[in-house]
UniProtKB/Swiss-Prot annotation:
It comes from the Bacteria. Modulates RecA activity. Pfam families: RecX_HTH1, RecX_HTH2, RecX_HTH3. One of its GO terms (cellular component) is cytoplasm. This is Regulatory protein RecX. It is found in: Cytoplasm. It comes from Haemophilus influenzae (strain 86-028NP). One of its GO terms (biological process) is regulation of DNA repair. Keywords: Cytoplasm. Belongs to the RecX family.
């Protein structure tokens, strides 16, 4: 194994968590061979310095605090970070995040003057906003029907 490859990964991991996929991409950009990449990653994983599960847990907490719903987080982890669906499912299942409450808080913050007498155009805008942030319709649909006094 190349100590240069190992040192490169350790240097990256000393700053923040990375998924295996991200580390592979960074090492390929630096022209490390597949063997060097595999060896360095295996050693870091054996020492528990790199873990896709731990990365996913941290990513979930970080993105949920920024108002992202489960759908968006799942998509980002899978497509952008290369985390396996099995790990994502486990992390989401074990998460103690109340997605309904999060959707309600996001809705209150973004649309503070909303009430149930709003036009269908406004309701459509809210619907699109919530879906684009990764919330499922069942997590916010009944919130749109609540009136402002129930939000206070």
């Amino acid at each position: 194994m190349s100590s240069l490859a190992f040192n490169y990964i350790v240097n990256l991991l000393s700053r923040r968590e990375y998924s295996e996929f991200e580390l592979r991409n960074k090492m390929q950009e630096k022209n490390f061979s597949e063997e060097e990449i595999d060896d360095a990653l295996s050693l870091c994983q054996a020492k528990n310095w790199q873990s896709d599960r731990r990365f996913s847990e941290n990513y979930l907490n970080s993105r949920s605090q920024k108002g992202c719903g489960v759908g968006r987080i799942r998509q980002e982890l899978r497509q952008l970070k290369g985390v396996s669906s099995d790990i994502i499912d486990e992390v989401l299942m074990e998460s103690e995040i109340d997605w309904y409450e999060m959707a309600e808080n996001l809705l209150r913050k973004k649309f503070p003057n909303y009430n149930e007498q709003q036009t269908s155009k406004m309701k459509q805008k809210i619907w699109q906003y919530m879906l684009s942030h990764g919330f499922r319709s069942d997590e916010f649909a009944d919130l749109i029907g609540q009136n402002q006094s129930e939000w206070d």
